[in-house]
């Protein structure tokens, strides 16, 4: 089934729309996103932390003039927090009112208590609400942090854009949302989930692409500073670190140094701001001193 109503006319047009939101997508990612829109298929993104998986959903929502609904996954995430739950307090109050006014037959009371008036819709159900008139981008972020049981629950949603509620029946989207799932590969996600999605691995960008990203996202930074910071981050990615800096750290570092009115990179500036790019004490201690000077020298001669 082709749902072209929310799709750009071409891959190039989609790339331009993302660029208008300051998101620089390579060709492979743009093709995958275009097909996800055209075919109404979920898009599963894997890659290291900080390479732009989550921000793609934000950029796509803005580019498509859609509502972004985000579900942040975590260990122990369940249906009540992700999909729906019943408003038990209101149901109990309604039950007491029914009892006080003569009550209903048990079957009628059940219909009265289990209807949409008492349903608390969580992100997944909100995204496929048939009454929703605006487009939706549903971001299921860091699915690898959730339990395998929760993955199993997602299969119906990903395959049919519907959710079955035992007391109400099946809720189906009238307009399929664009579903983007992300994973940092802290564990392997089950094949059954991946089979229902288009798949895209996002690499760390090339130096030239990362420079384009920095220019788009931190345009006020001095060009020389941006180039030097980007080169230094690329050097750091070649060092054995506990937490390798991603593109988000490059952007934060350039923005931080620009906020300090730095125009070029030197050891003092790096020492002052290492906590912006390295997020582990052992990593900071490991590269300080002579090692940092060597890394900076290599970066400045790129």
Summary of predicted features, one role per range:
Residues 1-302:
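C-terminal regulatory/interaction module of P-loop NTP-utilizing enzymes
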């Amino acid at each position: 089934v082709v749902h072209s109503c929310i799709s750009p006319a071409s891959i190039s047009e989609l790339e331009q729309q993302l660029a208008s939101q300051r998101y620089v997508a390579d060709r492979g990612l743009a093709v995958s996103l275009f097909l996800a829109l055209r075919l109404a298929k979920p898009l599963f993104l894997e890659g290291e932390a900080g390479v732009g998986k989550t921000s793609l959903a934000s950029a796509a929502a803005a580019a498509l003039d859609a509502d972004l609904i985000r579900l942040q996954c975590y260990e122990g995430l369940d249906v009540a927090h992700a999909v729906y739950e019943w408003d038990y307090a209101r149901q109990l109050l309604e039950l007491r009112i029914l009892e006080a006014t003569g009550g209903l037959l048990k079957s009628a009371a059940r219909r009265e208590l289990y209807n949409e008036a008492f349903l608390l819709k969580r992100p997944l159900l909100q995204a496929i609400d048939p009454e929703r008139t605006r487009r939706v981008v549903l971001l299921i972020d860091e699915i690898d942090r959730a339990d395998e049981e929760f993955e199993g629950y997602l299969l119906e949603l990903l395959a049919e854009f519907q959710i079955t509620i035992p007391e109400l029946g099946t809720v189906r989207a009238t307009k399929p949302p664009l579903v983007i799932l992300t994973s940092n590969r802290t564990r392997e996600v089950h094949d059954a989930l991946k089979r229902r999605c288009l798949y895209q691995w996002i690499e760390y960008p090339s130096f030239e692409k990362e420079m384009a990203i920095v220019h788009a996202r931190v345009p006020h930074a001095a060009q020389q500073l941006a180039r030097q910071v980007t080169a230094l981050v690329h050097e750091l990615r070649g060092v054995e670190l506990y937490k390798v800096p991603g593109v988000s750290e490059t952007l934060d570092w350039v923005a931080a140094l620009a906020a300090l009115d730095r125009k070029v990179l030197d050891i003092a500036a790096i020492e002052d701001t290492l906590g912006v790019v390295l997020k582990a004490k052992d990593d900071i201690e490991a590269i300080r001193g002579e090692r940092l000077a060597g890394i900076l020298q290599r970066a400045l001669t790129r």
